[in-house]
């Protein structure tokens, strides 16, 4: 180190000074002077080498610091990018969870509606079955014919009511409304009590009695 060289130089100066004080002749003085110059020159050369080594060490240290700084910067950038990626993944995960929940809700709603429709279809099929049974019964006994017409309506046609004209038709239309209740319309000839008959069949669900009452009402129009 430079401090060691300076200490060595101080030691050389002290030795030279001690020799100088004990020297009397001019020849010896000249020899000491040359020795002193050589010592100074050698020390200067060693000091120069040491200083260059110290400068090189400082440069290497600074370069090492710069490398560490660059590495730290790269590490921080990678860390920031990783945190950003993690945040994006979490966001996508939350979106996926919301989407999955929405899909599940839609599936459950579809299942409920499907069940409701299935139940309604079964109820309608049962009603139509009862209607067909009643129709078959009344077709033979009361001359009743049932036709399916526009708008999902059924048309009921009675014959054998007018003794003077047995083939003369007496008819009305029937369908199920949005509330799945019977709704009667388009009677020919017009019946005043049709609305009352409709209300009764909605309450009792006795369709056979409904048809019998309508036929009686049509028969009454013939004799009135």
From Swiss-Prot:
UniProt-annotated stretches for the region Interaction with the C-terminus of SPBC24: 145-224
Listed Pfam families: Spindle_Spc25
Region annotated Interaction with the N-terminus of SPBC24, chain positions: 1-144
UniProt-recorded name of the protein: Kinetochore protein Spc25
Gene Ontology cellular component annotations, sorted alphabetically: cytosol; kinetochore; Ndc80 complex; nucleus; outer kinetochore
Residues recorded as bearing Phosphoserine in the entry: 12
Gene: SPC25
Phylogenetic placement of the source organism: Eukaryota, Metazoa, Chordata, Craniata, Vertebrata
Subunit organization: Component of the NDC80 complex, which consists of NDC80/HEC1, CDCA1, SPBC24 and SPBC25. The NDC80 complex is formed by two subcomplexes composed of NDC80/HEC1-CDCA1 and SPBC24-SPBC25. Each subcomplex is formed by parallel interactions through the coiled-coil domains of individual subunits. Formation of a tetrameric complex is mediated by interactions between the C-terminal regions of both subunits of the NDC80/HEC1-CDCA1 subcomplex and the N-terminal regions of both subunits of the SPBC24-SPBC25 complex.
Keywords: Cell cycle, Cell division, Centromere, Chromosome, Coiled coil, Kinetochore, Mitosis, Nucleus, Phosphoprotein
Subcellular compartments: Nucleus; Chromosome, Centromere, Kinetochore
């Amino acid at each position: 180190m430079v401090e060691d060289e300076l200490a060595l130089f101080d030691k050389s100066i002290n030795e030279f000074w001690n020799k100088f004080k004990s020297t009397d002749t001019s020849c010896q003085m000249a020899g000491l002077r040359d020795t002193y110059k050589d010592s100074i020159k050698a020390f200067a050369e060693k000091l120069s080498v040491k200083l260059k080594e110290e400068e090189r060490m400082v440069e290497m240290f600074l370069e090492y610091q710069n490398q560490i700084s660059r590495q730290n910067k790269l590490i921080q950038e990678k860390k920031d990018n990783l945190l950003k990626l993690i945040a994006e993944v979490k966001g996508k995960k939350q979106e996926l969870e919301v989407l999955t929940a929405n899909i599940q809700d839609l599936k459950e709603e579809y299942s409920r509606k499907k069940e409701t429709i299935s139940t309604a279809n079964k109820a309608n099929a049962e009603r139509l079955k009862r209607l067909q049974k009643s129709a078959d019964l009344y077709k033979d006994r009361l001359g009743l014919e049932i036709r399916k017409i526009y708008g999902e309506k059924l048309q009921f046609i009675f014959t054998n009511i007018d003794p003077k004209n047995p083939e003369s038709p007496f008819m009305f239309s029937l369908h199920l409304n949005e509330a799945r209740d019977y709704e009667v319309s388009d009677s020919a000839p017009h019946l005043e009590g049709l609305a009352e008959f409709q209300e009764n069949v909605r309450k009792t669900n006795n369709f056979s009695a409904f048809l019998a009452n309508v036929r009686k009402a049509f028969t009454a129009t013939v004799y009135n």
